[in-house]
Amino acid sequence: MQKINGQDMKRHNVHLVINTIIKYGPISRTELRDRVGLTAATVINITNDLLERNILLQEGLAAASSKGRKALMLNVNPTAFYTLGVSLTTRRLRVGLANFQGQIVDHVDVTIRNTITPEEAVDLIQQNVQMLVEKHQVPTEKLVGVGVAAPGPLDTHTGLITVPPDLPNWRNVPLQKLLEERLQLPV
């Protein structure tokens, strides 16, 4: 059994809090504490840090359900981070931009042929990523990564598209590596 150090535990707790807020937000600290099973002090410390870093937002007060103060509602800041998604089929390339709440901000569809080469596809992906990022004025440091859906079979350990039956120019293509080098983002 592997030991977990304090930093790993803190990182785990922060991810747990963020993922819970993404799923259930807006949410009060009390409900958040109940859902994640951490102490009130830990939840307060984590959420205060995330508010200070502008990763979370305060979204008003909860409706009064009993006596006492209304609870402050927390949600993730949709513009704190962004992700990119790429879907490649034999007929279409789609590149999308999503915010931190998982909402699609925008996407671009490009009609392609199954004879497209990997180099042509990577060029198209880069052009459309750049267009979306510039159009929505997303700072590079807010881009956390790229998810890719492509015809298989795919070797998940090496990132190679091995022998897709409908893309004749795509035998043993290291798509993950090509995109990481070109986009300078995790894929």
Describe each region flagged by the PLM.
Residues 21, 32, 43, 47-56:
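Basic amphipathic alpha-helical segments that dock to polyanions
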Residues 108-187:
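Glycine-rich phosphate-binding loop and adjoining helix at the ATP-binding site
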Residues 70-107:
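Gly/Thr-rich phosphate-binding beta-strand-loop-beta motif of the actin/hexokinase/Hsp70
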